[in-house]
Amino acid sequence: MLREFLSEENIAFHKEYARQIRLKYSILEASLKELTGAGVKDLYRLKLDDRDRADALELLPQIILHDVFFSSFCECRYPRSVLVSSVYGSEAAFLNRLYKAAEGAQFGFLIIGRGASYSVVTDYKRALRYDEPLLAVDLCEHAYFLDYGFDRERYLVSALFHLDLKKITI
């Protein structure tokens, strides 16, 4: 439901950006067969030279985070999450915490995981070392600039308002 707060042009631009990352990874994957079907956790144990591991750890988490981002939103209907309300007191309190966590980050992803845990990830190499997020908000300029220009705060408020909080589990 990105269309709730992003234009078709912006969505197409962002999906093209994600496609370029996926293309770079597929080229790396074609040259290193051991990457085929590997998850982020696998990249730490595979026998790769340092440069190939660094490249894979830079690209694969971004692919996964963009996939999560593109599926993180919905048309808002309240209440959206009993779990979030029980952990944080209200959805508004949770969204306010997310906003405060993300407002200072100049790039990366705001990720939300099980139990409504959240963090801002700016180091893609370590982003998904433990668990994949349930929801993600892209904080980089390519995510919002066509529609919001330099008004990043307005993008962030709109994105947070449309998060599909029902996807959050324990």
Model-predicted segments: where are they?
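Feature for soluble, non-membrane regions of globular proteins
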Residues: 1-170
